[in-house]
């Protein structure tokens, strides 16, 4: 069983309010016991999201859906299919996949958007599927984008999507929520892209890893255009967060009023006078006594244009610093769901007008959607960019995901308005990729080097001021909330077949970022005939070849931070189960690994204090796998963990997130697929 519980939160938080993330989840949580129960960070909930989007991966989701025994989607109004990733690929194989997706969607009555209509996330916003204060998910990591319009958007994996198709529901553990406060006024020439690139670079020690983010600061945010907010929310994914939520304010309401006028469809099913009136009259805000895991602050007035890279979002430098280095570029890109909306294209056109793309540079442009391109054509911005020498691509992901025309080759340098510059992401692993705003990308395309718009007029880039920032963690209010809830905590109901407690000796794997290949070597991933016993023997093999001989069934692995980072292979969870281990503890877990855990019924706990104590205990010990002689007991009925040493001396007592009976049911059924099959059978 793999189920993940974070220790940052409490269980029966009867005496405090909710933050905005918790309030939105409350609206979409089902099966709460009692129905009036409030939900908080750390709690597992069953959610029925407003909408669920899948893109080119819709066919694998459909295949999984059918393999579950499902034949009809639960609610075809909940599901959206878009084709956006590999739209330049005209191979028979890809066209067949696209045809299969379209046929399936139409047979189910699902809203379907074909290749060329645009990037799924942009469509979700244009067509109102992602709407302020709703919960919208997608089988894509950039679902965070929806936070820019005040929707709680978060990614899911394919099994989750298949579950939603079949039952309308999946599970979510509410993450710790980080408050990111924006103060000050953004200087002229500084954009939303500069804000998020700076945040990724200055808070680059996983401060918000696997957190939900709420952006606050009414004065500063009110002056940020919605397109800036969408860019910022989009790249909270690269910052490590699971969502990036902006508040509902007058700027957002005005955005939707203008959108309604542009649609010219009074009876639009999602964006209409009624939904906008509801938005105005029913604004949700965080309670004054809501608890946040962290409070980060950045003064926007101290920002200047910033650039990410090369090849890492954790590296950011001011435009001033990089412009001094005369870094020649080969390719420039104005594409993606991050920065290819109308305002982005217009901004690039304003910079490039009257200039020509440098003869040593290839400049590629693709609109975020066909509607955006149409608007850009009507405004003249699209033609301005093409007249300068840019090469148009169809509306879609393209180079951002490393597909189609214009990829980086060995030794090349590219600057892009996209969201990811991981090595090899946009082409060759031997290329260098930088991320910047549309304005800087356009200027660089003309200059032939990384540079700013002012250089086109013969002026130097202004020197960057020092960024003013701060961070607070584990506030007193959070600690007080935990102690209060401890006193108020009652007994949690336990379903037949689910253990009331789990206990075992802690086995220390003292490393951070143990990836899925370290847990389950890739060379075994596609050996479909491998037995459970063989899986057990190779569990953690690439991390420590002696792991099997040092461990036994019933042990509990405890590891460092970001355990399970890497690929989406489910065997990283199932091989641990094969070793006879029901629970893993870590400082934190990779998000995909976490979802695969629950979906395969393995339990996990995030307890940073415990791994830190063990690291102090075994400082200087270089063994990879250590039997600690410390024993953990997790009392599920009280949502409490106790750790003692071999002499029964108390090491730690800590509250963890509550596991309700709805999530217990998933575990008892052997994971999410087993639960879905049971639901389908019950409802036949």
UniProtKB/Swiss-Prot annotation:
Catalytic activity, per the record? (2R,3S)-homoisocitrate = cis-homoaconitate + H2O
- EC numbers for this chain: 4.2.1.36
Q: Which cofactor does the UniProt annotation name?
A: [4Fe-4S] cluster
Q: Which purpose does this protein serve, as stated in its record?
A: Catalyzes the reversible hydration of cis-homoaconitate to (2R,3S)-homoisocitrate, a step in the alpha-aminoadipate pathway for lysine biosynthesis.
Task: From the UniProt record, give the pathway where this protein acts.
Answer: Amino-acid biosynthesis; L-lysine biosynthesis via AAA pathway; L-alpha-aminoadipate from 2-oxoglutarate: step 3/5
Q: Which gene encodes it?
A: LYS4
Q: What is this protein called?
A: Homoaconitase, mitochondrial
- Keyword Heme present in the record's keywords: the answer is no
Which GO BP terms sit in this record? lysine biosynthetic process; lysine biosynthetic process via aminoadipic acid
Q: Which InterPro entries match?
A: Acnase/IPM_dHydase_lsu_aba_1/3, Acoase/IPM_deHydtase_lsu_aba, Aconitase/3IPM_dehydase_swvl, Aconitase_4Fe-4S_BS, Aconitase_4Fe-4S_dom, AconitaseA/IPMdHydase_ssu_swvl, Homoaconitase_mito, Homoaconitase_swivel
Protein origin, superkingdom: Eukaryota
Where does this one sit in the cell? Answer: Mitochondrion
Instruction: Cite the SUPFAM superfamilies for this sequence.
Output: Aconitase iron-sulfur domain, LeuD/IlvD-like
MF-aspect GO terms: 4 iron, 4 sulfur cluster binding; homoaconitate hydratase activity; metal ion binding
Q: Which organism is it from?
A: Candida albicans (strain SC5314 / ATCC MYA-2876)
**What does UniProt give as the signal peptide span?**
none
Instruction: Quote the record's binding site residues for [4Fe-4S] cluster.
Output: 337, 397, 400
List the keywords (alphabetical): Amino-acid biosynthesis, Iron, Iron-sulfur, Lyase, Lysine biosynthesis, Metal-binding, Mitochondrion, Transit peptide
Q: Member of which family?
A: Belongs to the aconitase/IPM isomerase family.
Cofactor: how and how many bound: Binds 1 [4Fe-4S] cluster per subunit.
Which GO CC annotations does the UniProt entry carry? mitochondrial matrix
């Amino acid at each position: 069983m793999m189920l993940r519980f974070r220790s940052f939160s409490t269980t029966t938080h009867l005496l405090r309010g909710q933050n905005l993330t918790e309030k939105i989840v409350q609206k979409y949580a089902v099966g709460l016991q009692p129905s009036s129960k409030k939900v908080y960070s750390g709690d597992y909930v069953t959610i029925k999201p407003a909408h669920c989007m899948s893109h080119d991966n819709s066919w694998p989701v459909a295949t999984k859906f059918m393999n579950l025994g499902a034949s009809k989607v639960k609610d075809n109004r909940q599901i959206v299919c878009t084709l956006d990733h590999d739209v330049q690929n005209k191979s028979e194989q890809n066209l067949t996949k696209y045809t299969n997706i379209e046929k399936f969607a139409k047979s189910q009555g699902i809203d379907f958007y074909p290749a060329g209509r645009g990037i799924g996330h942009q469509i979700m916003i244009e067509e109102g599927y992602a709407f302020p204060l709703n919960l919208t998910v997608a089988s894509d990591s950039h679902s965070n984008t929806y936070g820019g319009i005040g929707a709680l958007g978060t990614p899911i994996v394919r099994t989750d999507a298949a579950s939603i198709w079949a039952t309308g529901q999946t599970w979510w553990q509410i993450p710790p929520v980080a408050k990111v406060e924006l103060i000050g006024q953004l200087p002229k020439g500084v954009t939303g892209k500069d804000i998020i690139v700076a945040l990724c670079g200055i808070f680059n020690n996983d401060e918000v890893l696997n957190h939900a983010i709420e952006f606050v600061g009414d004065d500063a945010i009110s002056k940020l255009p919605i397109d800036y907010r969408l860019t910022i929310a989009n790249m909270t994914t690269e910052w490590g967060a699971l969502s990036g939520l902006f508040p509902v304010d007058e700027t957002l309401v005005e955005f939707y009023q203008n959108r309604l006028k542009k649609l010219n469809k009074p009876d639009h099913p999602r964006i209409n006078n009624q939904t906008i009136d509801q938005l105005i009259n029913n604004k949700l805000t965080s309670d004054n006594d809501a608890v946040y895991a962290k409070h980060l602050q950045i003064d926007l007035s101290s920002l200047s244009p910033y650039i990410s890279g090369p090849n890492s979002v954790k590296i950011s430098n001011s435009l001033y610093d990089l412009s001094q280095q005369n870094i020649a570029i080969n390719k420039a890109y104005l594409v993606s769901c991050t920065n290819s909306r109308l305002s982005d294209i217009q901004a690039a056109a304003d910079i490039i007008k009257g200039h020509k793309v440098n003869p040593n540079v290839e400049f590629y442009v693709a609109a975020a959607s066909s509607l955006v391109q149409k608007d850009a054509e009507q405004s003249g911005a699209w033609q301005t960019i093409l007249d300068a020498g840019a090469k148009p691509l169809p509306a879609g992901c393209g180079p951002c995901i490393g597909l189609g025309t214009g990829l980086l080759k060995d030794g090349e340098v590219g600057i892009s308005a996209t969201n990811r510059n991981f090595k090899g992401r946009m082409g060759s692993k031997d290329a260098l990729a930088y991320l910047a705003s549309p304005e800087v990308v356009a200027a660089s395309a003309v200059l032939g080097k990384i540079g700013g718009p002012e250089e086109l007029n013969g002026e130097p880039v202004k020197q960057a001021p020092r960024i003013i920032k701060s961070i607070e963690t584990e506030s007193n209010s959070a600690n007080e909330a935990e102690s209060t809830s401890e006193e108020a905590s009652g007994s949690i109901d336990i379903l037949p077949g689910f253990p009331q407690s789990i206990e075992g000796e802690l086995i220390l794997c003292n490393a951070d970022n143990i990836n899925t290949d370290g847990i389950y070597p890739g060379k075994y991933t596609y050996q479909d005939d491998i037995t459970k016993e063989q899986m057990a023997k190779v569990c953690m093999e690439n991390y420590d070849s002696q792991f099997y001989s040092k461990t036994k069934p019933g042990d509990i692995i405890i590891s460092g931070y970001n355990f399970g980072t890497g690929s989406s292979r489910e065997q990283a969870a199932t091989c641990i189960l094969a070793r006879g281990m029901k629970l893993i503890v870590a400082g934190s877990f990779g998000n995909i690994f976490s979802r695969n855990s629950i979906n395969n019924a393995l339990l996990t706990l995030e307890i940073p204090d415990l791994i830190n104590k063990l690291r102090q205990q075994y400082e200087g010990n270089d063994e990879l796998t250590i039997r600690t002689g410390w024993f953990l007991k997790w009392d599920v009925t009280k949502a409490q963990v106790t750790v003692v040493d071999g002499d029964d001396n108390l090491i730690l007592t800590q509250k963890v997130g509550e596991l309700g009976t709805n999530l217990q049911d998933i575990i008892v059924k052997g994971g999410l697929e087993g639960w879905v099959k049971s639901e389908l059978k019950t409802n036949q």
